[in-house]
UniProtKB/Swiss-Prot annotation:
Originating gene: gcvT
Catalysed reactions listed for this entry: N(6)-[(R)-S(8)-aminomethyldihydrolipoyl]-L-lysyl-[protein] + (6S)-5,6,7,8-tetrahydrofolate = N(6)-[(R)-dihydrolipoyl]-L-lysyl-[protein] + (6R)-5,10-methylene-5,6,7,8-tetrahydrofolate + NH4(+)
This protein's name: Aminomethyltransferase
UniProt xrefs under InterPro entries: GCS_T (IPR006223), GCS_T_bac (IPR022903), GCST_C (IPR013977), GCV_T_N (IPR006222), GcvT/YgfZ/DmdA (IPR028896), GcvT/YgfZ_C (IPR029043), TrmE/GcvT_dom1 (IPR027266)
An annotated GO cellular component: cytosol
Species: Salmonella paratyphi B (strain ATCC BAA-1250 / SPB7)
Coiled coil (residue ranges): none
Amino acid sequence: MAQQTPLYEQHTLCGARMVDFHGWMMPLHYGSQLDEHHAVRTDAGMFDVSHMTIVDLHGSRTREFLRYLLANDVAKLTKTGKALYSGMLNASGGVIDDLIVYYFTEDFFRLVVNSATREKDLSWITQHAEPYAIDITVRDDLSLIAVQGPNAQEKAATLFTEQQRHAVEGMKPFFGVQAGDLFIATTGYTGEAGYEIAMPNEKAADFWRALVEAGVKPCGLGARDTLRLEAGMNLYGQEMDEGISPLAANMGWTIAWEPADRDFIGREALEMQREKGHEQLVGLVMTEKGVLRNELPVRFTDAQGNQQEGIITSGTFSPTLGYSIALARVPAGIGETAIVQIRNREMPVKVTKPVFVRNGKAVA
């Protein structure tokens, strides 16, 4: 039996089509995925992301533990509330999960991890935390609502107390603050400004209804996927998994190689991959009729004249751009164009950086 978030009833009242998403009943859309997508790009939309797992870590050696657990380096986190995106890797350099870590005090950090990887994440974290005497608290008492879009922060702020508005005033991206009973973070998964707001489960339904009344459009998983793909953001299980290196998933920027004497899980394997060479994640754009879909082959000829083949990891029609886009994992050496096999047709595609839209504007 699939689990329900505290907002399940609100979704049904809003007319959602519910689907099983990694063991959670979640809204796919509320009538029009397209309208939901455009609402986030032009105004404000919201997503129930309560299926994600919030994990609080307490202990005097928490920073030391996270410097070993994660490929990115929490030594960078010195300001209260600052957040960091990182891969959590296995010994062979594969991605167990990608997550966000927040710093509050020297003995209090917070992780937000994916729903699909919850059990293995918690097992991995618990196993490696033991020598550091870390107290691990899974915050199943909290719901999480993402409010995203150019007008999202302004509309969400109409629900805040004066103290909460003051707490978030001027807050830069990738920060979080506990203000009253809300944890408000300037993070998201859409390429737009906004907040991800955690609150006690019993407050979630009223908060959701108030956001609807403030003119924030409920959005489902369908729009969430097209928005994140336009923004060039990875989806676990597609762009990366335990068999795929962050170097092959456009996550090289999340690996903190310095200081060279910092040991972290997967470091040795990544250093070998960096030396030998590795696949890369690129963007693909197809302006001709048709849709680039997951798992379609991508073919090109490298500079040495060798035929090479990669694979589309995520593909869709871009509602913002009006043509098809994709992320693809390919061998190194791809040029500016490639061929994608769609049924019996060979379709030319332009190769771009793996990001297509930022703040509502085309970048590809």
